[in-house]
Regions:
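Hydrophobic, lipid-facing positions within transmembrane beta-strands of outer-membrane proteins
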Residues: 15-21, 75-81, 99, 112-116, ...
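Repeated loop/turn-to-beta-strand initiation elements of outer-membrane beta-barrel proteins
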Residues: 28-33, 89-93, 120-130
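Outer-membrane beta-barrel "beta-signal"
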Residues: 118-126, 139-151
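Transmembrane beta-strand segments that form the barrel wall of outer-membrane beta-barrel proteins
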Residues: 1-9, 37, 62-69, 93-105, ...
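Residue-level signature of outer-membrane beta-barrel architecture
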Residues: 23-25, 83-85, 118-122, 133, ...
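C-terminal hydrophobic structural anchor segments
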Residues: 82-113
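Outer-membrane beta-barrel domain signature
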Residues: 38, 42-45, 49-51, 99, ...
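C-terminal outer-membrane beta-barrel translocator/porin domains of Gram-negative envelope proteins
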Residues: 1-87
Length: 151
């Protein structure tokens, strides 16, 4: 999805954008991959971006291996790569790697999160449990739990 808006704040024009792209691809009957990119940001044309307009990121939705909303910046991007294996039952396992940055060049300054996940999918809900580590604190892993209702 893509969202772009703009306007005036305190006499300065701004543009705010949000972009999310993902592609899912089967490798074999039981093995699949996912590539995802999220970018959000705001740019003020004649004044600095106020901290109240910063974007928050980190955690299960954007950069696993870190606390929920651990980082804030005028803009950020996170790229994710996942490889998943689906058993014959409703259980799926996956390995993942997230790389995030608050700079345009994601390779220059970044945070890494990586780990393993387990999901159970049924007709009523999806339960995901992911254990993630970061490149800044290998000894402090994060457990991310997500429950999604499928009503």
């Amino acid at each position: 999805h893509t969202i772009i808006d703009g306007g005036l704040q305190d006499g300065s024009g701004f543009v705010h954008n949000e972009l999310e792209i993902q592609t899912y691809f089967p490798v074999t009957a039981n093995l699949h991959g996912l590539i995802k990119w999220i970018g959000k940001g705001i740019h003020m044309f004649s004044t600095p971006v106020p901290k109240s307009r910063y974007e928050w990121f980190g955690g299960t939705a954007s950069l696993r291996g870190y606390r929920e909303q651990e980082f804030s910046a005028p803009q950020f991007q996170v790229a994710s790569l996942e490889m998943g294996y689906k058993t014959k039952s409703s259980v799926q396992t996956k390995l993942f790697l997230d790389i995030g940055s608050d700079h345009l060049n994601i390779l220059a300054t970044n945070w890494l999160g990586y780990g393993i996940g387990l999901s159970q999918v049924n007709e009523n809900s999806i339960i995901r449990v992911e254990y993630a580590l970061s490149n800044h604190s290998i000894s402090k892993g994060k457990l991310h739990i997500k429950w999604i209702s499928r009503l």
